[in-house]
């Protein structure tokens, strides 16, 4: 069953409904903390946050997209920085709709590729992205940047 949603660009006023979604992804945050982050992100032309709302106007998904130049390609790279679907809406096509919109935005921005990383333990996410045509190409390593 596909859930009919409206996908639109988020604003900082959406922080109260986006914060719980980030919590479901494993990043607990409240609107007071999230809003300033969104202000910084949305002030940039290369950052977009999409929100999916169901027919009642409830937020059921979010996607953060970053478009940037890289040395390896002539054209920019677009990266999905976050994708989360509310537990009640998973498996209903909301994620696919958000990724399709991100793909459209990436093309409009002139990007040559759409990329995403997921945690090694998220086998369900790996399968989801592969169903959408993404291919596994490598590993991601992360370390904290220490303040001096």
Where on the chain are the PLM-derived regions?
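Acetyl-CoA-dependent GNAT
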Residues: 9-16, 20-75, 81, 144-145
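Short coil/turn motifs at secondary-structure junctions
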Residues: 68-70, 88, 121-123, 146
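A short, internal acetyl-CoA/4′-phosphopantetheine-binding micro-motif in the GNAT/acyltransferase core
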Residues: 83-90
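Conserved acetyl-CoA-binding loop-helix of GNAT-fold acetyltransferases
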Residues: 91-104, 131
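Conserved active-site alpha-helix within GNAT-family acetyltransferase domains
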Residues: 96, 112, 120-138, 143
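Conserved GNAT acetyl-CoA-binding A-motif
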Residues: 99, 106-118
